[in-house]
A protein has these predicted regions:
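Glycine-rich helix-loop-beta junction characteristic of Rossmann-like nucleotide cofactor-binding loops
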Residues: 66-70
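Non-catalytic C-terminal accessory region of glycerolipid acyltransferases
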Residues: 4-5, 133-246
């Protein structure tokens, strides 16, 4: 597929997402007025918009589970980050209500803004005050038995093809303080469909392969999020990533 066609495909994808967002906007506007009451509705619309957008342009998701997942409990979902499609992957994957924690710049995006003003958690990483507020919101969310999705690398890799980079500790401190199980998610090849925001290489139809590893407990023995928890999650995700991305 030529770069020109990939650019056309990218514009088609963005157009599809915008179309479904505008289609659902009257409902979103209403639900956003009282997000605590309509949390599940907002999560549902976020999922519907993102999945409808990829289906229209021929992108599919295939998930392989290392062990069966009990979606009746909440998790801290830790996923690698190589593409804006990673958000859609987690919307597809998580069967229970959850919030994203993401960079504050997502408040500038006309589509993600309404979600990061209501159900998702924006954080300005270079601000200690913003980071603390986001941390407290995340703990409150988990205490309400909702799940939280975090990309522990902190950003999409600047290099192509991408690698799995060392994790930041935030996700593991949050999980340990609330003793919430971590669910490692390895998104193997979203970057081959659409790397980063697509501006460099465009996008194309295809299947995104995802490996969900066995949940990892952050029990009482790990109250302070010892480096061993972070290292264990990273090692297992790195191993799964390397098997697919040789």
């Amino acid at each position: 597929m030529t770069r020109f066609l990939k650019k056309i495909h990218l514009y088609a994808y963005f157009t599809a997402v915008l179309f479904f967002f505008l289609l659902g906007y009257p409902f979103l506007f209403y639900y956003a007025r009282t997000p605590q009451k309509y949390y599940r509705k907002l999560v549902l619309f976020r999922r519907w918009i993102s999945l409808a957008g990829i289906y229209v342009v021929g992108i599919r998701i295939h998930v392989e589970y290392e062990t069966p997942i009990d979606w009746s409990q909440n998790y801290v979902l830790c996923a690698n980050h190589t593409s804006i499609l990673d958000i859609t992957v987690l919307n597809y994957l998580c069967k229970s209500p959850f919030s994203f924690m993401g960079k504050i710049e997502l408040l500038k995006n006309p589509i993600t803004r309404i979600f990061f003003q209501t159900i998702d958690i924006p954080v300005k990483r270079d601000s200690k005050i913003s980071a603390f507020k986001a941390y407290k919101r995340a703990l409150e969310l988990l205490q309400k038995e909702k799940s939280l999705a975090i990309f522990p690398e902190g950003k999409i890799d600047d290099d192509y093809p991408p690698m799995l980079h060392p994790f930041k500790s935030g996700a593991f401190r949050i999980a340990s303080e609330n003793r919430t199980t971590i669910l490692p998610v390895v998104i193997q090849d979203a970057w081959q469909i659409l790397w980063d925001d697509g501006k460099t290489y465009g996008s194309k139809p295809g299947i995104i392969h995802v490996k969900v590893l066995a949940p990892i407990s952050s029990d009482a023995e790990r109250d302070k999020a010892s480096p061993s928890l972070e290292a264990e999650v990273y090692h297992k995700m790195k191993k799964a990533w390397n098997i697919y991305n040789k």
